[in-house]
Amino acid sequence: YDAQMDEESLGNWVREKSIIAGTEIFEEERVERFTSRGEITSSRFGRRQYDVIVNAAGPWAAQLNENNEISTKFYLRLIRGSHLILDHQVSGSYLFQEHQDGRVVFILPYLGKTLVGTTEVSQLLSENTICTEEERQYLLNVYNSNFKRHVSNSNIISEFSGLRPIVASHLRSKESYFSVASREAETEVVDKLITVYGGKWTSAPSLSEKVVRKLKSKEFL
């Protein structure tokens, strides 16, 4: 169905393709520090020098640069989106625009169950990325407002939340909700450091090509 994806499976597919292409992946490896001069200090390898560093850490990209005293002209707003998995499967796929706030909420068949999402809540990196009771009731109310069969907390078999990094300059103060803001990414080059701000799965291939072009233009490769 349109409007849904299995990002975990897609991420694992990309990971496996990267390994086949010769990429070394170090999971749960803490980077203690990095500089715009290409230096990285990690708990496993100590200090190492690289031709280029690409900071593509998603919601953490801006905070990592700030922690390493690297100035930037871009900042991120983090928007939490929460989803519910209900214990039955709806007969079709639906997109509803809520009259109260104008947001779009989807209700879709998902692995034999029903997926309901998403919310839009601004949050900080220091906060837990979890579905709150307020979000839970919001999504249940959307469902119950559009279907004869009503559901409650007892029908929820799973829930998950994620963060959308949105470049702050893409938000306009007059916007009443975040989904109308541009999800396009920005890239910034500071010496030997390239940082990716924002972005999304659907534009990831073109974004990676853009980063490679920047690498070549700076004669890193």
Task: Indicate where each model-derived feature is located.
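Short beta-strand to alpha-helix junction loop
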Residues: Y1-E16, F26, T129-E134, Y197-S206
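Flavin (primarily FAD) cofactor-binding/catalytic cores of flavoenzymes
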Residues: N12, E16-K17, A21, E28-V31, ...
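Short, conserved active-site loop motifs that form the nucleotide-linked donor/cofactor pocket
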Residues: G22-E24, L193
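A conserved short coil-to-beta-strand element within the FAD-binding core of flavoproteins
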Residues: I25-E39
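Glycine-rich nucleotide phosphate-binding loop and flanking beta-alpha elements
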Residues: R33, W60-A62, G92, S122
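Core beta-strand elements of the Rossmann-like FAD/NAD(P) dinucleotide-binding domain
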Residues: S43-V52, A56
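Flavin (primarily FAD) binding-site architecture
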Residues: N55-I70
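C-terminal catalytic lobe of FAD-dependent flavoproteins
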Residues: S71-L115, V121-L221
